């Protein structure tokens, strides 16, 4: 990281100046050197993270205005901050990959998602789903494992993982995933879905709201169609 190298350089310079012009006392020199390193490092980190934060906000506004291509370009320009701060490049790659995934441009999304930040459970889950769609089950399981390990208190990551396991015919393993999620989060939606799987039924993800649909595992229109059909059936029963 450039900010760390610059901080070390400033620290070393302050040590040399202290020994040359102020005091030969090694302990005082080391204390001043440590303070200089910390101050420079914190200052540079704040400057870089502020620039990255501003970049993310601009990209988010562009996404909300349906200017996804512009958002991607702005984020790609932000990759120049990668050498300055740890995980910045990975976070930006996660955002770019997520945008491509939301556009259903999965071919473009995967390379960025693979270079993304593992603690971003949304982008990591999108990568796992991409592997599932390519029938790369072992890579899907491995990637979901990373998403869960970095976000143990996030209920939805367990739900998405379990949904995918059930989709590939591993219902028992899906139930195990939900059990782990319930133990970590005590989320009622996970409990409800585990009960459904144990009863031989499909999971219901509408409890997670619109966020669920970004994974493109279920079409919102299909859900509405099912709900309409169910309501129509109930009306017929009432009429009889």
State the predicted function of each range.
Residues 50, 66-67, 97-108, 134-143, ...:
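Alpha-helical linker/edge segments of TPR/alpha-solenoid repeat scaffolds
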Residues 61-62, 99, 129-131, 163-164, ...:
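Residue-level signature for tetratricopeptide repeat
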Residues 24-107, 112-114:
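N-terminal topogenic membrane-targeting module
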Residues 10, 181-240:
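Terminal, low-structured helical/coil segments at or just beyond the last alpha-helical repeat
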Residues 42-46, 77-85, 113-120, 145-153, ...:
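Solenoid-like repeat scaffolds
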Residues 1-51, 221-240:
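Helical anchoring/docking segments at protein termini
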Residues 82-156:
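Alpha-helical adaptor scaffolds
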């Amino acid at each position: 990281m450039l900010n760390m190298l610059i901080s070390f350089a400033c620290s070393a310079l302050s040590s040399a100046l202290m020994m040359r012009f102020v005091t030969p006392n090694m302990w005082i020199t080391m204390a001043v050197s440590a303070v200089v390193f910390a101050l420079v490092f914190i200052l540079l980190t704040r400057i870089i993270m502020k620039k990255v934060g501003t970049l993310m906000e601009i990209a988010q506004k562009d996404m909300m205005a349906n200017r996804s291509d512009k958002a991607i370009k702005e984020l790609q320009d932000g990759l120049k901050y990668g050498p300055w701060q740890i995980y910045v490049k990975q976070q930006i790659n996660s955002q770019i990959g997520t945008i491509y995934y939301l556009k259903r441009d999965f071919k473009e999304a995967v390379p960025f998602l693979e270079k993304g930040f593992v603690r971003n459970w949304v982008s990591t889950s999108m990568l796992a789903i991409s592997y599932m769609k390519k029938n790369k089950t072992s890579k899907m399981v491995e990637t979901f494992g990373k998403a869960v390990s970095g976000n143990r208190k996030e209920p939805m990551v367990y739900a998405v993982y379990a949904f995918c396991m059930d989709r590939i015919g591993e219902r028992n393993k899906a139930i195990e995933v939900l059990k782990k999620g319930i133990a970590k989060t005590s989320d009622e939606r996970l409990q409800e879905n585990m009960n459904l799987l144990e009863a031989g039924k499909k999971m219901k993800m509408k409890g997670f709201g619109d966020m669920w649909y970004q994974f493109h595992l279920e079409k919102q229109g299909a859900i509405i169609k099912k709900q309409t059909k169910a309501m129509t059936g109930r009306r017929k029963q009432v009429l009889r």
